[in-house]
Amino acid sequence: ANIEGVYNLYEAARKTGCTRILFASSNHAVGFYKQTDYLDDKALPRPDGLYGVSKVFGEAIASLYHDKFGIETAIVRIGSCFPEPKNHRMLATWMSYDDFTALIDCIFNISQLGCPIIYGISDNDGKWWDNSGTAYLGWQPKDNGRNFQESLDKRMERPKPDAPDAVYQGGYFTVDPIYASEDD
């Protein structure tokens, strides 16, 4: 779906004259960066698995259709969009529903969008991503994952310092197998 479906989406947009798309990419397009790396919209892809690779493909299609046909796309590398962070890694990657809704409003109400990469996160302490390159959108996330840290600390232990969830931006996706079975 992330390969053929994205191509079909952009072809349909081209054929019907649609001029703007919000592409739901993912933090897993850059998941093999370490949590000590601070990324901006110029960071090269480092997918952490085949899912991340499929999102990089979608970002490339968005760029191609912008350059070739003028279809504007907000490439939103969504961190974690849930009512609240589900684990300690998500304290940095979390995006509230309110902040996502505000981002959508900005994307579809600005006169000229282009084809920017936007990190879909709230205004979290300890975030790994920099959206200053897309300040022209006027999006100002207001929520912060830190408000959930105390309840997370009570519910679960923090990951060990060498665990993928504590080392890589993509967390455990970096160790998921990309083959069908152990015999492959």
Language-model region placement:
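Core catalytic loop region at the nicotinamide-binding pocket of NAD(P)H-dependent oxidoreductases
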Residues: 72-73, 107-132, 136-137, 141
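Conserved C-terminal active-site "lid" loop/helix of NAD(P)H-dependent oxidoreductases
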Residues: 123-140, 155-182
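Conserved Rossmann-fold NAD(P)-dependent oxidoreductase catalytic core, especially the SDR/UDP-sugar
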Residues: 4-46
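Alpha-helical substrate-binding/gating segment
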Residues: 16, 77-84, 94-116, 123
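Conserved catalytic Lys-bearing alpha helix of Rossmann-like short-chain dehydrogenase/reductases
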Residues: 3-9, 18, 54-62, 100
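Catalytic helix-loop patch of NAD(P)-dependent Rossmann-fold dehydrogenases
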Residues: 34-70
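Flexible, glycine-rich beta-alpha linker
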Residues: 29, 46, 50, 68-91
